A protein has these predicted regions:
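Charged, compositionally biased N-terminal leader segments and the immediate start
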Residues: 1-22
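A short glycine/serine-rich beta->alpha loop
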Residues: 22-31, 60-66, 100-107, 135-141, ...
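C-terminal auxiliary extensions adjacent to catalytic cores
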Residues: 49, 169-242
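Long, compositionally biased
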Residues: 2-4, 15, 77-99, 219-225, ...
Length: 242
């Protein structure tokens, strides 16, 4: 399509503040620490294993399919629905459920740190009621503040649709691991972008499968990855928080 055609159709393109908010929350500049996590990749690197680009893609795909999708994405979907209805008690139930499902302490602590930081940052410039109530619950010890729930509350406050909120989470998660691989010297920038591009269909499919899953159907099962993440937890010196 020509430049003239594009300019003639500008009036039909609907862009609003929620699109900018989506970019804001997914940006590495936003202070959640999401891009300082390797999710166990650093432990693999220091074990001496040589990982090919395709193996890295398969690792992220496994994490999306068996951990982040059925657990975090499910929690986000349920939390978003409760936040949109200002239902704090049900929101806190999701908070407790996803907290209890994160078996590795380092992963659990990182999720809480990111989620709490996200809520408090947004509260500093937003007076959304359910966001304020959730932040108060975290401060009072009635909630933990795991990232999927915090992101759902933040997305609701910014009028970001539920599925786009899930995109933020899965994209940030995938990029954090690719970024860790780059910083560890495991692959080059062009290869990293190729991996992200190859993951797009799976990210969309994982959201489709899990965003409307009921809370009682939430699950995760990736024992070998859990073991790797535990080994990172026990490392004395590390570059990444997970």
């Amino acid at each position: 399509m020509s430049t003239d055609d594009n300019s003639n159709n500008n009036s039909s393109i609907m862009v609003d503040a929620s699109d900018l908010s989506m970019m804001q929350l997914s940006d590495s500049f936003f202070p959640t620490g999401m891009y300082s996590m390797s999710n166990g990749l650093e432990a693999i690197f220091y074990s001496g294993k040589k990982m090919k680009t395709e193996e890295l893609r398969e690792l992220i795909a496994t994490l999306l399919q068996y951990q982040i999708g059925p657990a975090d994405c499910t929690a986000l979907g349920n939390a978003y629905e409760h936040a949109s209805k200002f239902n704090l008690p049900e929101l806190l139930e999701v908070d407790r459920a996803i907290f209890s499902m994160k078996l590795v302490q380092e992963i659990r602590d990182a999720s809480i740190r990111s989620g709490t930081q996200l809520v408090r940052c947004i509260r500093s410039f937003s007076d959304n009621r359910i966001l304020r109530q959730y932040d108060d619950a975290i401060r009072n010890g009635a909630a933990f503040g795991p990232y999927p729930v915090a992101l759902a509350v933040a997305a609701n406050a910014f009028l970001i649709p539920k599925r786009k909120a899930a995109l933020i989470m899965l994209y940030s998660f995938s990029v954090s691991i690719v970024g860790a691989a780059l910083r560890l010297g495991m692959l080059q920038h062009f290869d990293g972008q190729k991996v992200i591009d190859q993951l797009k269909p799976q990210i969309l499919n994982v959201i489709k499968e899990n965003i409307s899953r009921p809370l009682e159907g939430m699950w995760q099962f990736a024992p070998s990855i859990d073991i790797t993440q535990i080994s990172h937890e026990r490392m004395n010196s590390k570059m990444f928080i997970t």
